Amino acid sequence: MATPGALAKFRLPPLPTIGEIVKLFNLRAEKQLSQNFLLDLKLTDKIVRRAGNLQNAYVCEVGPGPGGITRSILNAGVEELLVVEKDTRFIPGLKMLNEASGGKVRTVHGDILTYRMDRAFPKHLIKSWDDEPPNVHIIGNLPFSVSTPLIIKWLEQVADRTGPFTYGRTQMTLTFQQEVAERLTASTKNKQRSRLSIMSQYLCNVKNCFTIPGRAFIPKPKVDVGVVHLTPFVQPKIEQPFKLVEKVVRCIFQFRRKYCHHGVSILFPEEIRIQLTEQMLRLADVDPTLRPTELTMTHFKKLCNVYREMCDQNPHLFSYNYREELRMKKLQGKSTEEEDDLLQ
């Protein structure tokens, strides 16, 4: 029978506080790296709890900085914690955490945008996509400057089942600038509904967990921060290639305040624009006077399916780029003022 001590929750031995580590290594948040430290362990514990049960889990933490969330992850009883940190100033403090945890922390000095996460963890953790999510998690207080390109990269990897999703439906618990968090989770008719809403919600169950006031960070950002949890679906809500979905959604939200037919129209070259726009909306059974924020996921699914059929019939259609057409018109002095604005 297990002793009470064996059941005790894992706790790090006494260490300098996060604030003391910041002073010890003379750490300052770098504005150009969009760094904001979260030093309140009650808040970092709350973030980690939203990731779910991390007992014996394998976790990748993005941008650990001075190690606030890192400590909370270790205290959750993980088997292994991989931290990917770009800033060399934080490496000594992270090594200190590794020693205190008995070697549970593996530190990689590198950029998460280029790090090969498909090689991050043991192969025995891989689960079938149809199974429950693997015991692998991504957690991070993301710098504002990389949060959007990073989540788009990961969403594409969800679609392709590559990168961290080689292991299965890996869950993500991440912080974003509050406005980005609201876009990720915005529903139909919400003013924050955007390209990011569709791209995340067609692939994942997305939850806006809670908001952290900006004053909790050092230095204090001008905005609050939202904690978002994403779990990939077994079956995406739109079953088309990621690049195709992204193109359709991007074009439609190019004119977010206008009727949706404006955005649909720029999927097609000028000489056949009117005809194919009418055809696509008719076949998808979408009201051309709906605005992008009013379109449901079902609308986008139908639009993507019809566009795929049109591209199959005309292989050159998918490679058409509206912005390239505008650039050529501008060079020839034939563009309108409105078209010039779109190139800004």
Swiss-Prot record:
Top-level EC class: transferase
Any one of the GO CC terms: mitochondrial matrix
SMART domains in the record: rADc
Keywords: DNA-binding, Methyltransferase, Mitochondrion, RNA-binding, rRNA processing, S-adenosyl-L-methionine, Transcription, Transcription regulation, Transferase, Transit peptide
MF annotations from Gene Ontology: DNA binding; mitochondrial transcription factor activity; RNA binding; rRNA (adenine-N6,N6-)-dimethyltransferase activity; S-adenosyl-L-methionine binding
Listed EC numbers: 2.1.1.-
GO BP terms in the entry: rRNA methylation; transcription initiation at mitochondrial promoter
Superkingdom in the source lineage: Eukaryota
NCBIfam families noted in UniProt: ksgA
Name of protein: Dimethyladenosine transferase 1, mitochondrial
GN (gene name): tfb1m.L
